[in-house]
Structures are given as structure tokens and as C-alpha cells.
Amino acid sequence: MECSATPPKLYPTVDTSTTVAPLPKSSSSSSSTNNNNLYPSINVNDLVNNIFPDPTASDSASAPPLATEEVILTIHGAMVHLIDKSYSVELACGDLEILRLVQGDITVAVFARVGDEIQWPLTKDEPAVKVDESHYFFSLRPVKESESSDHSVNETENEMLNYGLTMASKGQEPMLEKLDKILADYSSFTAEEKQKEENVLDLTAAKETSPEELKGKRKKMVEKQCTAYWTTLAPNVEDYSGVAAKLIAAGSGQLIKGILWCGDLTMDRLMWGNDFMKKKLSKAEKERQVSPGTLKRLKRVKKMTKMTEKVANGVLSGVVKVSGFFSSSVINSKAGQKLFGLLPGEMVLATLDGFNKVCDAVEVAGRHVMKTTSDVTTEIVDHKYGAKTAQATNEGLSAAGHAFGTAWTVFKIRQALNPKSAMKPSSLAKTVVKTAAKERKKGKKSSK
């Protein structure tokens, strides 16, 4: 057997003569080697040009938008009074400006300002009422002082600041329509309506005065009449604001006029109001003595203006503190908690639309009273003065007056009235008076 035979190989033989060594990358060889490349080519132009944005652009986008102050409305010939039973004090006279603080696309706060002296916030938890073509009033709960924590409930209710706004409305009707729209958007606004044949208070000076005339000889006459006007309506405004604050705190953004403004013998009360107005006008010069309570309210007015200015400056500088503007009852209520949770850290201007939340009993009873009462008016003056002239100075309760100025809430009204039964005005009055009397007794016991 021959030994020259080669043993079989375990691996196949590789022909290295056809292997091409890798060539360096060049423009000339890229086209020739494109077919031999195992991976697809990548075009750099198809990639995103700048995956990471410029750091300066990132910083500017994350910064909070700059807050600005906008004047959305200016009306000439405005006069503001602090409404008081003894003597309504004039606070300022000049141009009315509605200011809006805006941060980006968000409205942070809205203020009303007259001249450079008085300024107050417009919020959905504070009532604003249009009495007629020339008169508005605003009810504000002032910033609580530390030493007032031990005051009684009645004293706390009397701490409401009521501002009476009088406009020289001659020739400014379109501007006042804009004002009504703004108040409807940013406050708990109610426009009262009166019948054409009714003239609650014989006061037409403001309506027949233009802003130019207010700067001349007519100014003194208008000032006297406005002081008398707001002093006359002071009891009604205080009762109204007390009820409005309670209903708003319970989740209602609007009062039901059928209940709050119902009453008999309307003409007697209108005559009483006109006589009272004439007396105030004839004695306006003598009634210059301001009560101690009025002096305290004047101090609170200044504090409210200063607080409003602080908030405006805080918003413009990026630091906002607004809790002082809202009463604790609103903050602690369920509706208030939902409201304040909408825009944390901002002055809340969201809607507290509570008309649908008011119980059906009040609506049904209110509509029934409106239909069955012989003479019903929606004027402020009718809210206080009772069924007879002799009851005007009486401390007794009536269906259209004091009964709704007590410590009522919408939930107690629901318990007092039955919506399924057709209630007469007399039975409504009895129910209201009984409930109000119980509340007054409880208040006296607690004060003792």
C-alpha cells in the first residue's frame, strides 16, 4: 500500500485569490464599492437638524409670562359713597376705570377704581347691583382684623362695606351698557328693573347730568342729592348685601327677586321713601356728624384700597396673595372649595353660578308671590319698609323686609317652604316670620 495518498481535510479550502481588501473611504471609490456594502447608506440630510433646542430658548419658554395691567373701560363722571345709615360719606369723584390684571392668556384679577383714591376688587363671590340707569352698589366683605375675632355675629354682618357708585349718565348710555356686561362677567351682578309708572325716589340729577356738567356749578347739587340718596337706601342695601353674601356662600350666584322684593301696599312705601328723600335733601348741610361706626368703616375702606393695591403690585411682580379678599364662609363652603380649587395660586374669577343650586321651593314660592301679590315692585326701597308706613320704624318682621335679613341660608329656606303646595303670601309670611324669630332668639342667647 502506498504512503503518498493525502488524508481527507476536515474543513473546506478557501480560495484567497479572489478576496478584496477593504479600501479607504473616498469620493471616487464610494460609487464602486456601494454594491459591495453590507449595510444601507444613511443620508445625513434626512436627520433632524437640531435634536436638542437652544438652551436660551428652553429657559425663556419655561419662565412664567409677564403680568400686565389693562384698562378695559373708562367712564367719566363717577362718584363713590360709603353707604351708611346715619350719613353716607363721599369717598372719591373722578373717572371710573375697570382694570384687568392678565398673565399670559389668564385673567388673574379685575379691579374697579375711581380717581386715584378708591379701588376694590370685582369677584364672583361679591354682589354688584344696578339700581337704575345711574346708580350701582357693591358689597364687599373687608379684610378681617385680628382684634375683631371676638365680635358677635351681628357686628360681623355690619362690617360689610357697601360702596354706592353714581354715574353722570347723560350721553354715556353705551358706556354704561359695557359696564353692565363687565360686571356680569366678573361679579355676582343683578340689574333691578322698575315699572315705568313707578318713581321710587325723585332723584334725576345724576341721570340729567353729563360728565362736563359735573365739573361745574352742578357738582354741589349732585353731591348733596347722592349723599341723601345713598343714606336713604342704606338700610335696604345692608339687608340685601347680608342675604346675598349668605346665598353666594351657599352656592348661589343670584338672588330670587320674587322672594326678596315682594310686599303689599307698594305705593305707601314709595311715598314714604320720597318724603324721606326730601327731608334728607333739606337737611343735608346739617347732617355732617359721622357716627363712630362710620369712622371704623372708613378705616376699613382705606385698608381695602391698600390691600387691593398690594395684590395688583404682587401680581405684576409675580407674587400673589389673595386670600384676604374672600370671606371664610365662602372658603369653607363646598361650593367655595370647588371654586378655589379651579385656579390655585390666582385670584379666582371663575363662575360661582349657583342659581340652579337654589332649591326649587324658593323658586316656586317666589313665582307664586309674584303672581298673587297685588302690587309688587323690584326697587331697592321696597326691600325694607313694611306693609304699612307705621312699620317703617318698627323692629317687627315682615315678609319683604327684616325676615330675609336674619341668619338665613338657602338650606333653611328649603326646610321652611314646601314646593309642592301652592302657598299664599300670608302663609309664606307667617312661615318666614316664625323661622326668623327663632333665629333672632338663638342669636340673643349666643350673644349673652
UniProtKB/Swiss-Prot annotation:
Induction: By salt stress (e.g. NaCl) and cold. Induced by P.tabacina. Residues 1-56 form a transit peptide. Residues 26-36 have a biased composition (Low complexity). Residues 1-36, 422-448 are annotated as: Disordered. Keywords: Chloroplast, Plastid, Transit peptide. The keyword Plastid applies. Residues 248-416 form the Senescence domain. It is found in: Plastid, Chloroplast. Residues 439-448 have a biased composition (Basic residues). Expressed in leaves (especially in midribs and trichomes), apical meristemic regions, stems, roots and flowers. GO terms for biological process: response to cold; response to oomycetes; response to salt stress. Its main location: plastid. It comes from the Eukaryota. The keyword Disulfide bond does not apply. One of its GO terms (cellular component) is chloroplast. This is Senescence/dehydration-associated protein At4g35985, chloroplastic. It comes from Arabidopsis thaliana (Mouse-ear cress). The lineage of its organism: Eukaryota, Viridiplantae, Streptophyta, Embryophyta, Tracheophyta.
